[in-house]
């Protein structure tokens, strides 16, 4: 039932102190009431909204409706897109890997962000105010903080995973498993929860913001407690993770550049293949980098607004300046599925395979689908880490050829079991280890690799005058218990021999 009210009364003569009678007429669709209320002085006909526990802002109605429509589109896209990411990455055997667990977790956080934020924001925008009460406001803001922080921490974990995959490939093989990736994700959620709960216990608060149709933590109140929470929140969930991400990608770039230079000097066919695999890993790292950059761009306007208010300049902020950045930040939930649908070939093929109705949109070729099906049908015992080209240096040439590419890889060549995964540590796949080739790649024309570095032999196998002992290093060809068709979760750069 719609209601409105208006003031009606007698015009009082100037100076007539006995004129205190007035009437408030409450108009409904079926009834009329006349309520006697005291008035002082002359009255005029004007409208009053009914009292409400939450404040409102004086903006045109269409502003609420436009923002509500945008957030509804963002929510629908985020729910559908991230649900597809979770479904496809969990369904496809080639994508069900330890490294991709971080991508799935990011999609879960974005999915929950879309589910909990967009419908409520849209409904409040239709009413042009927050209508759900104090506790729902706190819960709404808590969910936004929790899932937003979790997304940022997950992106940090993805950057670290890509960094290890390229700069420390064999270390990643031996150390990263699904169980350990799951443990990292548990830490991510607990860390996010730790920064989302304090407003419930009096450190800052969750309150309506902007156009008063959504809620967030209180960054507008200029008190020491509120300012301390806001500053620490940005330091530990935005700036420090941002620094870690930047450091990881700087290390990735440096490794790729150095590896390319050293491989050109070695001029070995197998090392060129290794470099190509590393380049493939770099392509995946670039996809993750695009997701990270877009996430940071989405949250940067909101960060600027919050930090501006924290610095004591909240009087410069308008309701629009608070609400629009909040909408942009919530839109970060749709970047992940869109980017992977455009740039991740295996993801596109998997969607086309499991959701045929989307094939025309994705434009996946039939031969790619057949190739994906055949690769997914082969035995899961497929080699993903094979090193048949090893590097070596003589003691006399060490000064010239013991750069990072040669020296660090050689350091682990004598300890071949450092390349094994946990699935092989129990000896269940010993038969899959094939010690086939000996060291064959030459850096100089008359040297082969030494595990101890104590002697050398020439290319024909004869001992040189300097040699006291020749040690040949068998190089294992290792087959992993994995579902990945090309070892994508392990970094194609892991075909390197060694790599601490």
Swiss-Prot record:
Membrane topology annotation: Multi-pass membrane protein
Alphabetical UniProt keywords: Cell membrane, Chromophore, Disulfide bond, G-protein coupled receptor, Glycoprotein, Membrane, Photoreceptor protein, Receptor, Retinal protein, Sensory transduction, Transducer, Transmembrane, Transmembrane helix
Transmembrane portions of the chain: 66-86, 102-122, 139-159, 183-203, 233-253, 287-307, 323-343
Tissues with expression: Expressed in a subset of retinal horizontal cells.
Region (Disordered): 404-428
UniProt topological domain (Extracellular) ranges: 1-65, 123-138, 204-232, 308-322
GO BP term, pick one: regulation of locomotor rhythm
InterPro entries per record: GPCR_opsins (IPR050125), GPCR_Rhodpsn (IPR000276), GPCR_Rhodpsn_7TM (IPR017452), Opsin (IPR001760), Retinal_BS (IPR027430)
MF terms in GO: G protein-coupled photoreceptor activity; photoreceptor activity
Pfam family, any one: 7tm_1
Glycosylation sites noted in the Swiss-Prot or TrEMBL record: 18
Predominant subcellular localization, coarse grouping: membrane
Disulfide-bonded cysteines: 137-215
Family membership noted in the UniProt record: Belongs to the G-protein coupled receptor 1 family. Opsin subfamily.
The protein's role, per its UniProt record: Photoreceptor implicated in non-image-forming responses to light.
UniProt protein name: Melanopsin-like
Organism this protein belongs to: Danio rerio
């Amino acid at each position: 039932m719609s209601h409105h009210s208006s003031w009606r009364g007698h015009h009082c003569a100037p100076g007539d102190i006995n004129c205190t009678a007035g009437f408030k007429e409450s108009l409904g669709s079926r009834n009329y009431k006349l309520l006697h209320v005291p008035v002082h002085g002359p009255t005029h006909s004007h409208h009053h909204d009914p009292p409400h526990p939450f404040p409102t802002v004086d903006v045109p109605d269409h502003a609420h409706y436009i923002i509500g429509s945008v957030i509804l589109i963002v929510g629908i896209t985020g729910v559908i897109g991230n649900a597809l990411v979770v479904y496809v990455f969990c369904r496809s055997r080639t994508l069900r890997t330890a490294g991709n667990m971080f991508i799935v977790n990011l999609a879960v956080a974005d999915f929950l962000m879309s589910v909990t934020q967009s419908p409520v924001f849209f409904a409040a925008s239709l009413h042009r105010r927050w209508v759900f009460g104090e506790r729902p406001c706190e819960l709404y803001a808590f969910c936004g903080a929790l899932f937003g922080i979790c997304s940022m921490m997950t992106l940090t974990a993805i950057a670290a995973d890509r960094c290890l995959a390229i700069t420390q490939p064999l270390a990643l093989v031996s150390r990263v498993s699904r169980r350990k990736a799951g443990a990292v994700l548990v830490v991510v959620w607990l860390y996010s929860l730790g920064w989302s709960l304090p407003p419930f216990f009096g450190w800052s608060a969750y309150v309506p913001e902007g156009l008063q149709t959504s809620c967030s933590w209180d960054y507008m109140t200029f008190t020491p407690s509120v300012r301390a929470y806001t500053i620490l929140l940005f330091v530990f969930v935005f700036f420090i993770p941002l620094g870690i991400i930047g450091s990881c990608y700087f290390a990735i770039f440096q490794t790729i550049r150095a590896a390319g230079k050293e491989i050109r000097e070695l001029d070995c066919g197998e090392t060129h293949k290794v470099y190509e695999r590393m380049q493939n890993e770099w392509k995946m790292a670039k996809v993750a980098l695009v997701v990270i950059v877009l996430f940071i761009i989405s949250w940067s306007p909101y960060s600027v607004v919050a930090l501006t208010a924290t610095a004591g300049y909240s009087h410069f902020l308008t309701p629009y300046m608070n609400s629009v950045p909040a909408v942009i930040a919530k839109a970060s939930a749709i970047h992940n599925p869109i980017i992977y649908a455009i740039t991740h070939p295996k993801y596109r093929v998997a969607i086309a395979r499991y959701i045929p109705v989307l094939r025309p949109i994705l434009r996946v070729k039939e031969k790619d689908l057949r190739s994906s099906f055949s690769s997914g049908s082969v035995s899961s015992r497929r080699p993903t880490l094979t090193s048949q080209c090893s590097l070596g240096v003589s003691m006399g040439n060490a000064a010239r050829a013991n750069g990072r590419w040669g020296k660090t890889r050689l350091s682990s060549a004598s300890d071949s079991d450092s390349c094994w995964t946990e699935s092989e540590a129990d000896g269940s796949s010993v038969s899959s280890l094939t010690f086939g080739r000996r060291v064959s790649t030459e850096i100089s024309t008359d040297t082969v690799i030494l595990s101890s570095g104590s002697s050398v032999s020439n290319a024909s196998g004869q001992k040189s005058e300097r040699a006291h002992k020749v040690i040949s290093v068998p190089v294992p060809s290792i087959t992993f218990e994995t579902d990945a068709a090309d070892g994508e979760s392990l970094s194609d750069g892991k075909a390197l021999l060694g790599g601490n």
